Structure formats: structure tokens, C-alpha cells
């Protein structure tokens, strides 16, 4: 039997990825990894008694090249007698609307598409073509970003319904398999763009590390990840138990933690408990950095009253408020129709508002020495925290200082000859 098929069978069995009678949606981009995955699973489907459905998303990037990718996937699926689902998405528009990177927008749309297909065909599993090399690259990128133990463990082989049958297969083994079976997968030209950090890591940094430090740098990275993963699994279980003890109240939109009980935990558990609480509300931890959570925990330890606005996830984010006895996490309201952005402000602190290209800094200062002539000063006790900042919309009014009554913002803009954006 082909070496890749043997390794794939071992991996699937080791991690209990598939069971007889299941339907498996296979994400296929047309590149070497997913092409080899679909072809290999087709060879093993009868032995495993699984039904396969290929799924390909046209992201709306790369023009004619993407059209050829879709055509290739359809022809490959037909040759293997596998039903195929193709869908087109306007990822560039979604990226602009939600202010995301191209890769993040594509990832979100792609995962939503695969889950829709899985629901439509009553599939129990979604198989992705992530390889051993992808694991190494992801771990190193996480390391350079300043990740904690969770990021150093890399992505898991199984995160139901997602499974990764090529988890232990190298990119070189993929290429050898494609050549041995006469497969001619598509080559994504964007993989040559060194503006993307992953591409630069793959083509420049990893070869340099292998040449000057350790020819088996990938093995070393994965060995470390394996050790970290085992420790991480144990600590995550402990943190889940601690979260139940710390949690005072929970709903779909809010979680309240006992700050004093949280503070009594070991530091490693404190961070993990807070991460798990955020993940339960947000569904994931992408863009939630170490520094932000650590600042919240420092406020708990100091007994301070502070508030933090976690990065927004499209229309929703998490607002975190630390008080003397509680730490409360709540989902921010979705922006109102016609309101391009809205965000909770950190008081005190600095809040980046990417859609507007601005940052708002709030400080708590003693009243003495302030010059009210050239700035607005508010009494802290008179403010209803949290403070929500948003872009203006038609009909908004304000009370300008020195003016008796209110005035429409639109009229103020007209008076000052401020053009519409």
C-alpha cells in the first residue's frame, strides 16, 4: 500500500477521527494537500464504510485562476465518483464590511460554508487538509506573536466536527503521492507572495533555521508542541473545574465571576479561567492577546475598578468590567442599522477603533489644575459606565457647550462646511 495511505490510516485510527457509516465533507481547494486528501479518502472509503462529499468555495479572489480551481475540483470529484458542492462568496466585500484581513475573512467564510454543507448533507465530520508542515508553521507564527501554551500546542488533530487526517503527513509526502498517482493539483499564486508572514516563514525562515541551527527544526518544534499539549490538556481540565467554582452567574450574553475567588487561584489558572470564560461567550479566542487579559487580572489583584473592550468579532465583541468583588464579561450590542461602528471604551485606557482609524484615550485625573476652557471635563461619579462610542447617524443631536438647547450633528457639520464622508 502507498506510504501516505498507510500513514493516513494510522493517524485516523490513533485519533479516532472517523467511524463506519459516517458522511464526511472534505474541504477541497484544489491545491496539493486537499487534492491528495480527497484522492486518498476515496481509496479508503469502501474499507472504512464512509460516504464522501467534496466542497469547494470560490472566495471571489484571483479571478480566472480561481475559476480554474473550481473547475479542477469538479472534474476531480467526478473522476472519483464523489458528489461535489461549489459555492461562490464575495469575500472581498465581507472583508471590507467587517474590517478583517483577507486571510481571516476567507477563513471565516470558508468554515461557515463547510458547516452549511455538512448540515445540508447530514455529515458528521468535516475533513481538512492541514499537514505536519502546517502545524510547524502555525506554532512558529504563534510563538512570534507572543502566544501562551495554548498557541505553542498548535491546532489539534480533532476538534469535532473537524478532523485533520493529514495531521502527521509532511508536504514532501503529499507531493510524492500526487506524482505517484498522476495528480496535477492547482498551485495558488498567492502562496508566492512574501508579504504574507506564513509564506515568508515557509520559504525563507525555516530553510535558514534548518541550515544554521537544526536540520530537523520541524521535529524539534513538534516535539515541544507535544509536551506542551499534554500539560495544556491537564491545566485546561483544572481551569474548567475552577471556572465552575468562580462563576456567580451565566447567561448567553453575560458571565459574572467572583473576583476574590478568582484572585485566590494560582496565576496559571487565573489566566486560563478568564480565557475559558471569554471563549464561552465569544465562541473563540482569536485576537484575544495575553496583555489584555493580564491587565484585567492585574486590576482584579489590585482591587481596581476598570473596564476593557475586547477586540470586536464582526458586529460583536466582549466588554469586560472589573469591580471590587466581581469580574463581568458581557457581549456588546450589535451596531444599529446605519451605524458603521460602535465600541465600548476602556476607562481608563486606550481604545483602538480601527473602522474610524482613530484611538480614544480616557484618563481619570484629579479636578485640580484642569483647564475647562479648552477641554470638556466630566465628573467621574456622574458618568454611567460603561461608555459606548459610535459613529454618528442621521438624526443624532448634541448640546454644544455654551449653546442653550440642542442641535443636530448634521447641521453642525453643514455650518462648519464638513463634507459627507
What annotation goes with each model-predicted range?
Residues 191-196, 219-226:
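Internal, active-site/partner-interface "lid" segment
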Residues 208-220:
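Inter-helical turn/loop segments and adjacent helix faces that build the functional surface
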